[in-house]
Amino acid sequence: MNSEESELKGTGTAEDPYQIGSAAALAEFAPEATTTRAMIVSMLARLEGVESANNAGFADVSNEWYATAVNWAANVGVVNGYEDGTFQPNTAITREQLAAILMNYAAYKGEDVSARADLSSYTNQPSTWAEEAMQWAVAEELITGVTNDELQPQSSATRAQVAAILQRFLAE
């Protein structure tokens, strides 16, 4: 078991959002560290009780500890890979990627994802592909500006940010 996998072991439930895959533990021991794409989808797969999934065809996922979670998330439309056919599971997740994944997950769960916030007051804007997801995440108060005028959508999401965002997301 590698360190990321052991960090995600836990008994989390939706009623105990900080314990989803030990999200609180992630924030407690290294709040400024980044969170990987694999860790995020693994947390969501734990919420869903996913035990198996068909191969989604990512060249870099095969039989790793996160393979079932990534394959499930791709198969149900929660995540997409990169143009080169990879998922890049060990890449730090950005704030806009997290917003997109959570919006897709909310849609998968049948939630209303139509809310949109005006992001024009922020000096840095999300990538075109992530614009609606960031508008939704800000409207739902899941993601807030890092400062009053900086949203920093392309910045890596710290473990502390991820824990707070997941707590707000699961509380809805």
Short names for language-model regions:
Residues 31-69, 76-96, 102-131, 144-156, ...:
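Feature responds to low-complexity, polar/acidic, surface-exposed segments characteristic
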Residues 1-33, 41-44, 52:
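Surface-exposed repetitive/solenoidal architectures
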Residues 158-165:
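C-terminal/domain-terminus segments
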